[in-house]
Amino acid sequence: SGRVMLYVPKEKWIGKLLEYHTFKIKLDENGKEKWKTIHRGKLINCSDIEIISKFNTEIRGLYHYYQLAHNVSVLGKFAHIMEYSMYKTYACKYRTTVRKMVDKYSRNGVFSITYQTKKGLKWCEFYHDGFKRVREVRLDADTLPEYGRKYNNPNSNAARIKRGVCELCSQQTKD
């Protein structure tokens, strides 16, 4: 039709999946590719809320980048692989099966993790808003959800090391 259109290149979302180490490609006996989701070992030591918010942030980030594209709905495939990689990450963390993790954390058919705030118990749900094409740009697209900013634990090992104070003798460390 002579118009310039924005599309989501297949190589980009597959490249992101490979970059995040969420799946591996195996060849069957006929030489056909088989995609197998895998857990993300680097996230196993993170808290439950950090794991789900990491996956949500990565999915939302790619969606918001390509939300004006004509074929943005192909990111549903991206989200599906990310979802099962997240399930496998939780299953590996708790040394159980994917089915048991889905059954344990599903609430009204949506995978959800609880977290505590000053106002009480809240739920962080896995992204399930779909990938509909947006015709107008949202100005608040870069605003993170509240749990993404507030849930950095000040008593985490990294924060304790950054303080530069020995916890045994209270002396300042050099590094």
What is each residue range found by the language model?
Residues 1-175:
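Non-catalytic terminal/accessory segments
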